[in-house]
Amino acid sequence: MNNERIYQVLKGPVFSEKAQVLGDTAGVQVFKVDINATKLEIKKAVEKLFGVEVVKVNTTITKGKTKRFGRTLGRRSDVKKAYVTLKAGQDVEMADLGDTAESAAE
């Protein structure tokens, strides 16, 4: 897998209460991924990008909602999320957004 495909597969982390609880208790990291990405591609991308060992990958596809824009109906895009279980004792280093917001306010 080349570097370009890695960045196409992993779109970014999911920052939510559920994702944070899973990360703290079960060692699971949650990522938004490409809708066509396979579990094997996701596993290889996380291992290569973050240098951790992946135990398993679970995925979900959330269907986009139908929204009204004036008289016309539109539809939001479908989103695929990957729940990546890491080997015990390993963690993915991500930027803490809370610190940057506080330093920007000063």
Swiss-Prot record:
Protein name: Large ribosomal subunit protein uL23
Domain of life of the organism encoding this protein: Bacteria
Job of this protein: One of the early assembly proteins it binds 23S rRNA. One of the proteins that surrounds the polypeptide exit tunnel on the outside of the ribosome. Forms the main docking site for trigger factor binding to the ribosome.
Entry similarity comment: Belongs to the universal ribosomal protein uL23 family.
Molecular function GO labels: rRNA binding; structural constituent of ribosome
Subunit (UniProt): Part of the 50S ribosomal subunit. Contacts protein L29, and trigger factor when it is bound to the ribosome.
Keyword tags: Ribonucleoprotein, Ribosomal protein, RNA-binding, rRNA-binding
PANTHER family per record: 60S RIBOSOMAL PROTEIN L23A
GO process terms (BP): translation
Matches recorded under InterPro entries: Nucleotide-bd_a/b_plait_sf, Ribosomal_uL23-like, Ribosomal_uL23/eL15/eS24_sf
Pfam family name, one: Ribosomal_L23
Species annotation: Acinetobacter baumannii (strain AB0057)
GO CC terms: ribonucleoprotein complex; ribosome
